[in-house]
Amino acid sequence: MFIWEVVKMSKSVYRADFPLLDLSDVIYMDSAATSQRPQAVIDAIDEFYKRHNANPLRGVYKLSVEATQDYENARTKVAKFINASGSEEIIFTRNATESLNLVAYSYGLNNIKAGDEIAVSILEHHSNLLPWQMVARATGAKLVFLDCEEDGEITKAEIDSKINGKTKIVACTQISNVLGIPTPIEYIIEKAHSVGAVAVVDGAQSIPHKKIDVKALDADFFAFSGHKLCGPMGIGVLYGKKELLDAMPPFLSGGEMIEYVSRDTATYAELPHKFEAGTVNAEGVVGLAAAIDYVEGIGYD
């Protein structure tokens, strides 16, 4: 980015939407790490704490019902935002890291065996590399890397040479957090499916910059964080195809993710709640919903 582009951006009409920028002369250039928050997101969180603060999904009194409505309405908004088939395909997590670990632990450890291969790109953030290293060590699977050219491109020839009948999971970023360049994610997903593999997409860097349609993309799993989308820290999303999520065991155990519990056994809640153990980050979810409204309001163009 050239300096005159930065200066032009600093005078943008949208700058006034962000208190930290509006009240200072800061020119913020670290949005790949975390975005600033617009006033609309701050106001939504403030309103939740002032008027609806209670533990969602845990009570039938007015405040808890309102908090539950806010929480589930946000889930519906996220599902619509990425064009998921239904809100049950949206799992709230702490961040993209937890979303990817959920897939690795709950799907990977239960579906990968010795001799299988897991393919990841050399461009991966640690969040989409270390979980698959763990799965490979635990199962005896082989971790295979899709290497890139000097300019960062992952070629179709490289993809074709590394994804084969032994490949069971392909995990790849949509946009590199280091280079900022897109991967040929559509072709990678198509190739993964052609050999019967599951495709896991790290969308943390892509979703702030382009409209995501998980149906058109045909990703089996798609992970992202709220804090890079003008939302608060501490809230992430995992999208997963319903048939895959239904077959996966819970990642964590605790309150609200069970239907019945006795001394010796328990039955788990239906999707999406079987993956959301413990007290949820309700204010983070509300802030994420407000961030989606803000981003859709200004548009991706």
Where are these predicted regions, by residue range?
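Pyridoxal 5′-phosphate
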Residues: 2-301
